[in-house]
Amino acid sequence: MNIYMKEYQLNVDPRILELLGPNLYTNIYYVLAEFVANAYDADAHNVYIISNKDDIRIEDDGHGMSYQNGEVKKFLNVAGVSRVKEEESMTRSGERRKMGRKGVGKLAALSVSESVDVMTISDNEQSGFVLSRRPIDGNKLRPIADDDIKFVYIQEHGTAIVMRNPQYRLNKSMDSVKRNLLKIFPLVNDNFKIHIISISLKISPSKHSQILLRSIDGLRSMKKGI
């Protein structure tokens, strides 16, 4: 529980959100790839792409972001300086080279949804805010109360992006979803798995892959670990 009110401010002109949001990406898979790349850079081992009736949720078990340590503020600094030092090109673990996505990619979800929940947990500290194409109070973002910060598959650390009422949907065939993701993001292996989860998408038999096709029922036991 927070002992003080957190404030979230996006370092970009609010007018850009409305103009750039729906035009930044026109392909749902490029949007997903941005957040898969963020998960990779956060040393995540698992990314969950969850297709629900009213939203598309992306969760990862990476480091998460701390408000107190300034990591959330850094995330919201869309116009931040690009990495130039070699030591900054590696992830926190030192085992991966960062994907090097541009800061504007953080707004990718606004291409799909007018309202996006961002929730994160790091060292038992939860933070959450709502990105919107039409911010009500200038650069200030609406905070999400601790009691409303919910995760489906992650527990101690990680980040969740929830695109409410998305304008684009995943393909009806899960194999098609897998093929599209592999084209855009091929860096899957034993240490980095993508789980595609849906109640409604059709699951076809496929060979073993680190992009795992799952139904909601088949994943109920995964909350305790993989």
Q: Where in the sequence are the language-model features?
A:
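GHKL (Bergerat-fold) ATPase N-terminal catalytic module, capturing the glycine-rich phosphate-binding loop
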Residues: 1-160
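Glycine/threonine-rich ATP-lid/beta-loop region of ATP-binding domains
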Residues: 153-226
